[in-house]
């Protein structure tokens, strides 16, 4: 009886989720931190197309800042609750153009002297569709530069996990956006 009920609930809910994903090819993350804030839009025209990630982040120190999709859309303990980089294939950390990388590894964004980073990234691993969708996960901008998995010496071990990008300056849950 329980399994029958579970099956009925599942059959009622999941088609609605799939339908919502098919209706919108856009997602949005509103980033919030103590000083840093921003809005990031992700657009993907079809499952086979690359995702386009665009937006603006304010309040950063001038220079490069690690920019990643993290595993969880959880902010109960600030950005720490977002967990590690989104890595469904169990790879080591890398840059956005590396052959080996986490799905969530988007490299760095660069803030100008005004503390603003204009984001425009096209990525072939980020997806709004299927089992590895980034919807419901977190977008995180870090306080420091991502070394793209190229750290050496005493920095090599952490580089393979996080890119040594430092503290999480701001984060936001990636949510379905209204269709345009």
From Swiss-Prot:
EC number(s) given by UniProt: 1.15.1.1
Iron recorded as keyword: no
Quaternary structure (record): Homodimer.
PANTHER family given in the database record: SUPEROXIDE DISMUTASE CU-ZN -RELATED
Q: Which pairs of Cys residues are joined through disulfide bonds in the record?
A: 79-171
> What Pfam families does this protein map onto?
Sod_Cu (PF00080)
Needed co-factor(s): Cu cation; Zn(2+)
**Single GO cellular component annotation?**
cytosol
Among CDD domains, the record links this protein to: Cu-Zn_Superoxide_Dismutase
Keyword terms, alphabetized: Antioxidant, Copper, Cytoplasm, Disulfide bond, Metal-binding, Oxidoreductase, Signal, Zinc
**Species this protein is from:** Caenorhabditis briggsae
> What are the subcellular locations of this protein?
Cytoplasm
Q: What does the entry give for GO biological process? A: regulation of brood size; regulation of vulval development; removal of superoxide radicals; superoxide metabolic process
The positions annotated for binding Zn(2+) are 85, 93, 102, 105
Could you tell me what this protein is called?
Superoxide dismutase [Cu-Zn]
* GO molecular function per UniProt: copper ion binding; protein homodimerization activity; superoxide dismutase activity
Signal sequence span is 1-19
According to its UniProt record, which reaction does this protein catalyse?
2 superoxide + 2 H(+) = H2O2 + O2
